[in-house]
Amino acid sequence: NSATTAVYSFQDWVSA
């Protein structure tokens, strides 16, 4: 689901 993917992408960006 794209909403879940967006959350993971956001978390990856924040932790970068």
Curated annotation (Swiss-Prot):
Homooligomer, may form homodimer. Interacts with p6-gag region of the Pr55 Gag precursor protein through a (Leu-X-X)4 motif near the C terminus of the P6gag protein. Interacts with host SLC25A4/ANT1, SLC25A5/ANT2, SLC25A6/ANT3, SP1, CDC25C, RAD23A/HHR23A, COPS6/HVIP, TFIIB, UNG, SF3B2/SAP145, KPNA1 and KPNA2. Interacts with host VPRBP/DCAF1, leading to hijack the CUL4A-RBX1-DDB1-DCAF1/VPRBP complex, mediate ubiquitination of host proteins such as TERT and ZGPAT and arrest the cell cycle in G2 phase. Interacts with ANKHD1. This is Protein Vpr. The lineage of its organism: Viruses, Riboviria, Pararnavirae, Artverviricota, Revtraviricetes. Involved in the transport of the viral pre-integration (PIC) complex to the nucleus during the early stages of the infection. This function is crucial for viral infection of non-dividing macrophages. May interact with karyopherin alpha/KPNA1 and KPNA2 to increase their affinity for proteins containing basic-type nuclear localization signal, including the viral matrix protein MA, thus facilitating the translocation of the viral genome into the nucleus. May also act directly at the nuclear pore complex, by binding nucleoporins phenylalanine-glycine (FG)-repeat regions. GO terms for biological process: monoatomic ion transmembrane transport; symbiont entry into host cell; viral penetration into host nucleus. GO terms for cellular component: host cell; host cell nucleus; host extracellular space; virion component. It is found in: Virion; Host nucleus; Host extracellular space. Signal peptide: none annotated. Its main location: virion. Keywords: Activator, AIDS, Apoptosis, Cell cycle, Host nucleus, Host-virus interaction, Ion channel, Ion transport, Transcription, Transcription regulation, Transport, Viral penetration into host nucleus, Virion, Virus entry into host cell. HIV-1 lineages are divided in three main groups, M (for Major), O (for Outlier), and N (for New, or Non-M, Non-O). The vast majority of strains found worldwide belong to the group M. Group O seems to be endemic to and largely confined to Cameroon and neighboring countries in West Central Africa, where these viruses represent a small minority of HIV-1 strains. The group N is represented by a limited number of isolates from Cameroonian persons. The group M is further subdivided in 9 clades or subtypes (A to D, F to H, J and K).
